Regions:
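N-terminal export signals
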Residues: 2, 8-24
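Beta-rich, blade/repeat-based domains predominating
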Residues: 28-35, 68-82, 118-133, 164-185, ...
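An edge-strand/N-cap motif at the start of beta-rich repeat modules
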Residues: 30-57
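Residue position within the beta-strands of beta-propeller blades
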Residues: 40, 88-89, 137, 189, ...
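Short loop/turn segments immediately following the C-termini of beta-strands
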Residues: 41-43, 91-92, 140, 192-194, ...
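Structural motif
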Residues: 45-48, 96-102, 143-146, 196-203, ...
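A short beta-strand motif characteristic of beta-propeller blades
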Residues: 55-68, 110-116, 155-168, 219-225, ...
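Short loop/turn segments immediately following beta-strands, especially the blade-tip
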Residues: 205-214, 257-265
Length: 329
């Protein structure tokens, strides 16, 4: 891996680029000014990449010094737009309630644990509500969607989809992906189901539960899609009201309207549009809306980019080890 001057990286220098060969992806001209970098996760690493070219830069490396495999795996990543701080989840061991959430500066300095091991079971995709100063994430084996303050305090459980003890191993209850629509007060999340089992769900709840509702009784919950192969991560285009997601079952990136038609059946919706195919265990997805592009990652070590309609797809990294969450910042 190459390195950058920390001051340059913190200031966003080295990120002032336009995606090479894709200045007008989908026919939309790229806006002037510095373009965002990609930030993404390896098993025990936080990395960044200039999507116009160059090599990945490792910001944080928690790999065991003896070369052994990490006991926990990083999964969800988000960057606070105002502070530049990077937040990410680590799943810990799947059979133990030992997941945690970390934070560092944009250049990788000042690594801090803000949710200590066991504060969440197996935290997955992570998002920031900057207006409310809250972190939101899905908890896989914890079978829940949770949130906390930006310093890790005041952890709340918004919805519970199963009992981690009684339902252990029931992957249909595993919460994985997560996205936010703060303007309308909605949280979107996936339940992946078994491996390519056609049990996958995409659901929506309110950020604020209705009066009288509990985490185990969310009468406001809406199932938007069911019987998906194995949906993983989410992102939203709020302007066009479009939902994007990766699916590890058919190894795709897809999109569909956020607002389902009246009287719809989540099991038979026909408005899913597959945009990218052939990924190696698809995981992360992130939209760069001003530049009409998206990025995606896979457990097979891929970091790819494409226009929002899937055109112009190409790989930036094709052998990066096990890769998970991704975001632009």
């Amino acid at each position: 891996m190459t390195s950058l001057n920390r001051r340059q990286l913190a200031a966003g220098l080295g990120g002032a680029f336009v995606l090479a060969g894709c200045e007008s992806l989908g026919g939309v001209a790229a806006p002037a000014g510095p373009a965002p970098r990609l930030f993404y996760l390896g098993q025990a690493k936080v990395l960044t990449l200039d999507a116009a070219g160059g090599s990945p830069v490792t910001l944080v490396d928690d790999s065991p010094k003896d070369g052994s495999r990490p006991t926990g795996v990083n999964d969800g990543i988000a960057v606070h737009a105002a502070t530049g701080q990077i937040y990410w989840t680590n799943m810990g061991r799947a059979d133990k309630d030992d997941g945690y959430i970390m934070r560092c500066e944009r250049d990788g300095a000042n690594v801090t644990t803000i949710v200590t091991p066991g504060g969440t079971f197996t935290p997955k995709q992570l998002k920031i509500d900057e207006t409310a100063a809250k972190l939101y994430w899905s908890d896989r084996e914890g079978m829940a969607v949770q949130r906390c303050n930006l310093d890790g305090s005041n952890i709340e459980t918004l919805v519970v989809t199963g009992n981690p003890v009684q339902d252990a191993g029931d992957q249909s209850r595993w919460c994985v992906g997560l996205a936010l629509d703060p303007g309308r007060g909605h949280v979107y999340f996936t339940q992946k189901g078994g491996d390519n089992a056609g049990q996958g769900l995409i659901r929506r709840i309110d950020m604020q539960a209705p009066r009288g509702a509990t985490s185990t009784n969310r009468r406001d919950m809406v199932t938007l899609f069911s019987r998906l192969p194995e949906p993983i991560d989410l992102d939203l285009d709020l302007a066009s009201r479009t939902l994007y997601w990766t699916d590890r079952g058919d190894n795709t990136v897809s999109r569909a309207p956020m607002d389902a038609p009246a009287g719809f059946d989540p099991a038979t919706r026909l408005d899913r549009q597959i945009l990218v195919r052939g990924l190696k265990e698809a995981i992360g997805v992130a939209l760069d809306l001003p530049r009409n592009r998206m990025a995606y990652t896979s457990l097979g070590g891929e970091v790819g980019v494409a226009a929002l309609d899937g055109s112009g797809a190409r790989m930036l990294v094709d052998s990066g080890g096990m890769l998970t969450g991704v975001c632009w910042a």
